[in-house]
Amino acid sequence: MKDDNFIKENNAKHLWHPMGHPADSLINPPKVIVSAQNSSIADVDGHETIDAVGGLWCVNLGYSNDAIKETISKQLYELPYYSGFAGTTNAPAIEASLAVREMFEEDGMSRVFFTSGGSDAVETALRLARQYHRLRGEPNRTKFMSLKKGYHGTHFGGASVNGNNRFRINYEPLLPGCFHLPSPYAYRNPFNETDPA
């Protein structure tokens, strides 16, 4: 890896950071995170802080968890990757799907569909909902309702049902038939009701 000065000098020059305009990233360069342990992260200048968003996607068990590192390392030597697409699968996917299904057995889950993240999961759920109604002979059931301020990802469908304008308005028009309802938040009371139910 290049030295810290090179990293700082090239920060935001070639990488388009999510949720920001490239020119803004040049004026206010993103913090460069260089290491992490448990729930703490450290930047290129040595400042350490708690990662209160959990890496946003994938570190709910903390950074540098030894059991996870060992499992990943072992798997990289056996089979680093293979798709479960078009008639193939792999043993870790089968084992993981059984473990997830067993966790949700009392809810009636019978199958698991793995995705690479939350946005992919929302896209898949939207497509499955459409397919479900089409197969039941109700192809016109195409509307989606979600809560204002709710976050549902950044892909096309996810942004469409996203209740947070920041992730939606710059890309509209998006998927038609998406409606955003006020959250049932008694403190702010968007319904102007006195009944707490």
Where are these regions (language model features)?
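Generic secondary-structure signature for well-ordered alpha-helical cores
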Residues: A12-W16, G20, S73-Y81, R101-E105, ...
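Conserved A3 ("GATE") glycine/threonine-rich loop of ANL adenylate-forming enzymes
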Residues: L15, S119-D120, Y151-H155
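Active-site and channel-lining beta-strand-loop segments
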Residues: P30-D51
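Conserved beta-strand and immediately adjacent loop positions that scaffold enzyme active sites
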Residues: N38-S40, R111, K143, E193
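Glycine-rich loop-to-alpha-helix module at the N-terminal edge of alpha/beta enzyme cores
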Residues: E48-E138, M145
